[in-house]
Curated annotation (Swiss-Prot):
Record-annotated active site: 40 (charge relay system), 43 (charge relay system)
Protein's recorded name: L-threonine 3-dehydrogenase
Cellular component terms (Gene Ontology): cytoplasm
Compartment(s) of residence: Cytoplasm
Important for catalytic activity for the proton relay mechanism but does not participate directly in the coordination of zinc atom (site feature) positions: 148
Annotated source species: Shigella dysenteriae serotype 1 (strain Sd197)
Length: 341
């Protein structure tokens, strides 16, 4: 079968032929329809320090997809041939304390599809049936293919009660924009998203977010005054991993504010911890999606009218995968979808 693989320990990704993966007793074989390129895939393409330490070579990559069930392991129940599915990209062990306690998203032995084991940038993918999620009929293939990053956004945004709250989202990448859109959809009062990339901020404006602020050109305190905010943000969603953005968030949070962090900062990031202490801030780390509560909420949000379509900016045939990666690497894109049909 055709597959996009990391064949060499250098920059790039290559189309190759690999065997169709073998189906285990508890697995599903999925024929891939559409995949989306994640920031993680760009890291792997660029072969940065994280990738060099993490990714085995050669390996099929990718973990954002939608497809059709074409094979079912003999011990699998609840699925049938033809089911349209996406899937949770974190494969968990099932035997650690968190897994046995129903907190599988906190599994200490998590293995990543397309990171630690073969991924979805291929004609076929095998995953445990436990990880598959049936896509409702009224959700398009395009939207289903981005459920993985959408799940990151939903998990982060819905970590706290947002109704009537003022929310700051730092980082207008696709996940940050989706998180801001979720916050607005579920009843936040003001949702402000910040970045220095004007293309991405314009995407955010198309999603109906209260205010998209280019912090290279305007002061966040001025934006708050413009919106009539007098006490600071109630909730912060840190999606950028950029130390200056996090420091600004700490400066502008109200006392008792709550922060969910999905962005990965450098290990040596320094902050003024007195702001956390004296403001009584609560900071929560976010990794992946809750299995599978986040997935049900994703589907429900779309079915209740949340429109994510503006975040999908580029579509290519898989044969034009290089154009897709070029678009992602340019910083001038939202989500990029590759069609395998």
């Amino acid at each position: 079968m055709k597959a996009l693989s990391k064949l060499k320990a250098e920059e790039g990704i290559w189309m190759t032929d690999v065997p169709v993966p073998e189906l285990g007793h508890n697995d599903l074989l999925i024929k891939i329809r559409k995949t989306a390129i994640c920031g993680t895939d760009v890291h792997i393409y660029n072969w940065d320090e994280w990738s060099q330490k993490t990714i085995p070579v050669p390996m099929v990559v990718g973990h954002e997809y939608v497809g059709e069930v074409v094979g079912i392991g003999q011990e699998v129940k609840g699925f049938k041939i033809g089911d349209r599915v996406s899937g949770e990209g974190h494969i968990t062990c099932g035997h650690c304390r968190n897994c046995r306690g129903g907190r599988t998203h906190l599994c200490r032995n998590t293995i990543g599809v397309g990171v630690n084991r073969p991924g979805c940038f291929a004609e076929y993918l095998v995953i445990p049936a436990f990880n598959a999620f049936k896509i409702p009929g009224n959700i398009s293939d395009d939207l289903a293919s981005i459920f993985d990053p959408f799940g990151n956004a939903v998990h982060t945004a819905l970590s706290f009660d947002l109704v009537g709250e003022d929310v700051l989202v730092s980082g207008a990448g696709p996940i940050g924009i989706m998180a801001a859109a979720v916050a607005k959809h579920v009843g936040a009062r003001n949702v402000v998203i910040t970045d220095v990339n004007e293309y991405r901020l314009e995407l955010a404006r198309k999603m109906g977010i209260t205010r998209a602020a280019n912090v290279a050109k305007e002061n966040l305190n001025d934006v708050m005054a413009e919106l009539g905010m007098t006490e600071g943000f109630d909730v912060g969603l840190e999606m950028s991993g950029a130390p200056p953005a996090f420091r600004t968030m700490l400066d502008t949070m109200n006392h008792g504010g709550r922060i969910a962090m999905l962005g990965i900062p450098p290990s040596d990031m320094s902050i003024d911890w007195t702001k956390v202490i004296f403001k009584g801030l609560f900071i929560k780390g976010i990794y992946g999606r809750e299995m599978f509560e986040t997935w049900y909420k994703m589907a429900a949000l779309i079915q209740s009218g949340l429109d994510l379509s503006p975040i999908i900016t580029h579509r290519f045939s898989i044969d034009d995968f290089q154009k897709g990666f070029d678009a992602m690497r340019s910083g001038q894109s939202g989500k990029v979808i590759l069609s395998w049909d």
